Amino acid sequence: MSKQKHSASSGRWLKEHFDDKYANEARKKGYRSRAYFKIDEIQTKDKLLKPGMTVVDLGAAPGGWSQYAAKIVGDSGQIIACDLLPMDPIAGVSFLQGDFRDDAVLEALLDRIQPLMVDVVMSDMAPNIAGNNSVDQPRAMYLVELALDMCRQVLAPNGSFVVKVFQGEGFDQYVKEVRDMFKVVKIRKPDSSRARSREVFVVATGYKG
C-alpha cells in the first residue's frame, strides 16, 4: 500500500516537473535549476545583490543561486558556496563540498571567508523529505537556524539574509528571531515557487550586528 502511494506521489512529481514552465525554461537557458528564477524574483524586488559583494550560498547544489549571484557580483565580487552534494564548477564561485555542521567543514568554510566580511548570506537548504510533517518540519527548522547562526558568525553590519523556510511549527518564532537581528524583514512567495509548496523566503536586510 505504501509502495503504491509512494509511486503515485513520485509519478505526480515527475509529471509536474516536466510540465513546469520554470523547469523547462531553466533547461532551455542552461540554468542550473528552477531555483534560479526564485532568486531572480527576490532580487528584482529587494535588490540584495550588487557588484563587488561577498556572498555565502548554503545548500548551493546544483548551483542555481550561485550561478545567478555570480553574474551580479562580477569579477570584483566573490561567492563562497557549500553543499553536501557535489556541484559542477561555476566561474567566480568557490565551492566546498561537505556538511558545515561538521567542525572541520565549518572551519574550512570560515577559512575561505575570512578575513572578508560577508555582504549577503543565502540559504536554499532543505532536508531530505520523509513525508511525515512531524519529522520533516523540525529538520527544516534546524537547517534555517543553522543559516541564521552563520549570519551571526560572518555577516557584516547592515548585511542581508535570504533563507528558504517551510511554513509550519516554529515558523512564527523563527521570523521573530530574524526580526530581532535585522532592521527590515519581508516574507516572499515567488511566482516560480510551486503553489502547493509550503516554502516561502524570509528576506532580511540591515543586519544589526
Curated annotation (Swiss-Prot):
Protein name: Ribosomal RNA large subunit methyltransferase E
Function (record text): Specifically methylates the uridine in position 2552 of 23S rRNA at the 2'-O position of the ribose in the fully assembled 50S ribosomal subunit.
GO molecular function, one term: rRNA (uridine-2'-O-)-methyltransferase activity
Keyword Transport: no
Predominant location category: cytoplasm
Top-level enzyme category: transferase
Subcellular location(s) per record: Cytoplasm
SUPFAM superfamilies the record matches: S-adenosyl-L-methionine-dependent methyltransferases
EC number assigned by the record: 2.1.1.166
